[in-house]
């Protein structure tokens, strides 16, 4: 049963949430949420590229009543966006995973559970009443992955998201500087960081140090090592996962038209166009620039999910106009939870929904499913029609 949460009175924009989270969280954990690969320019580019897409206002349409409902994988969701997989969420505030599950239930949208979630996949499925998807990485030892697939089947999961864009983890300067590792290593620098953020520290000590619970509950005693190699993953790996999983399979982290076509041919049910929020190859293009090219390659009917750089309801509309069928958001949720817990999360979701509905009406539409590239000013989107 969902729990009704009152929205935060401290937050009026995403930037408010980010600033409050920066004050409230230990630097080590705020930087983990806020940071990206290398010089972090790709993370900025993701958002800038979305913002540069200009929409064309339409007037004298009756847009008093508007619908945001979206069907994906045959399921009717109340909104065209869900929650991206995010590992170790409870570092932003105790119970963060459960807050996300509650909002998934309230809004009837999918919450993708990270392999490194601080709440077990079984518990998240229970809390979302079946709205969870499960995200996996592939490691050199696939036994644990197959164990999680088996657990997901037994629990009732219908959708598996396979992340393929981290064969090697790119350097993140802020994490290196702060000494952020999993498992945690606490030295004088980290101790001082925690001591100067007493609210977070006391709450975390009271609730227990967050752990990657899918590992903690493994029957084989697997331990999470953030730097563990995934470099051996190849097309044969994808085939094995496809053969092992009879539900819907989403392949996440695709930016190449050539890769997208092959992944489709290998039997994936959907592709998630993503550059990992700018946290992997720093010299990659923005994810929104790759989206229409992949849509053009795969045709109109193949399901595409989009993430990376989404910061507003307007960004969701832009992504849908550029060819996405569904959108996932991540970092804004962590800012909101870091800023004011469940109340912050409730408020930022309300803001995004409001922006989404307003943008839909201002481009002259009443149904989210009516969005096509026609709403994009042609200067920005010539000769592409989706």
Give residue ranges: language-model regions:
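A gly/proline- and charged-residue-enriched helix-loop-helix capping module
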Residues: 106-127, 131-145
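Glycine-rich active-site/cofactor-binding loop and its immediate structural neighborhood
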Residues: 77-116, 121
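Alpha/beta enzyme core
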Residues: 102, 140-306, 314-335
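An N-cap/entry alpha-helix motif that binds or orients negatively charged groups
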Residues: 2-74, 183-233, 369-371, 377-386
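Alpha/beta catalytic cores of nucleotide-metabolism and tRNA/nucleoside-modifying enzymes
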Residues: 1-51, 289-307, 311-386
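Short, conserved beta-strand segments within well-ordered enzyme catalytic domains
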Residues: 54, 69-71, 80-84, 110-114, ...
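Short, basic, glycine/proline-bearing loop/turn elements
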Residues: 82-88, 131-137, 219-224
């Amino acid at each position: 049963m969902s729990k009704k949460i009152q929205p935060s009175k401290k937050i009026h924009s995403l930037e408010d949430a980010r600033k409050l989270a920066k004050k409230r969280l230990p630097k080590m954990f705020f930087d983990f949420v806020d940071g990206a690969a290398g010089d972090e320019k790709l993370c900025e580019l993701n958002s800038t590229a979305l913002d540069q897409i200009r929409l064309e206002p339409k007037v004298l349409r009756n847009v008093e009543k508007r619908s945001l409902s979206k069907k994906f994988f045959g399921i009717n969701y109340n909104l065209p966006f869900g929650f991206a997989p995010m590992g170790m969420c409870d570092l932003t505030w105790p119970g963060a995973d459960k807050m996300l599950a509650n909002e998934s239930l309230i809004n009837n949208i999918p919450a993708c559970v990270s392999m490194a979630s601080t709440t077990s996949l079984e518990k998240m499925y229970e809390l979302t009443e079946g709205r969870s998807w499960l995200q996996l990485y592939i490691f050199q030892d696939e036994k644990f992955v197959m164990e999680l697939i088996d657990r997901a089947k037994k629990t009732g999961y219908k959708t598996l998201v396979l992340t393929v864009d981290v064969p090697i983890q790119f350097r993140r300067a802020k994490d290196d500087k702060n000494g952020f590792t999993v498992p945690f290593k606490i030295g004088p620098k980290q101790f001082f960081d925690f001591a100067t953020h007493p609210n977070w520290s006391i709450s975390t000590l009271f609730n227990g140090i967050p752990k990657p619970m899918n590992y903690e509950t493994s029957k084989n005693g697997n331990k999470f090592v953030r730097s563990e190699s995934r470099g051996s993953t190849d097309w044969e790996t994808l085939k094995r996962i496809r053969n092992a999983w009879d539900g819907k399979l989403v392949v996440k982290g695709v930016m190449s038209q050539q890769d997208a076509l092959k992944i489709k041919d290998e039997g994936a049910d959907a592709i998630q166009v993503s550059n990992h929020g700018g946290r992997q190859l720093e010299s990659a293009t923005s994810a929104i620039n790759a989206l229409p090219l992949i849509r053009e390659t795969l045709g109109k009917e193949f399901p595409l999910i989009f993430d990376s750089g989404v910061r507003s309801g307007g960004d969701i509309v832009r992504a849908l106009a550029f060819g996405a069928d569904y959108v996932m958001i991540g970092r804004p949720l962590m800012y909101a939870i870091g800023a004011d817990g469940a109340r912050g999360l409730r408020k930022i979701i309300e803001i995004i929904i409001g922006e989404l509905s307003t943008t839909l009406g201002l481009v002259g539409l009443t149904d989210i499913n009516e969005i096509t590239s026609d709403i994009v000013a042609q200067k920005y989107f010539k000769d592409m029609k989706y």
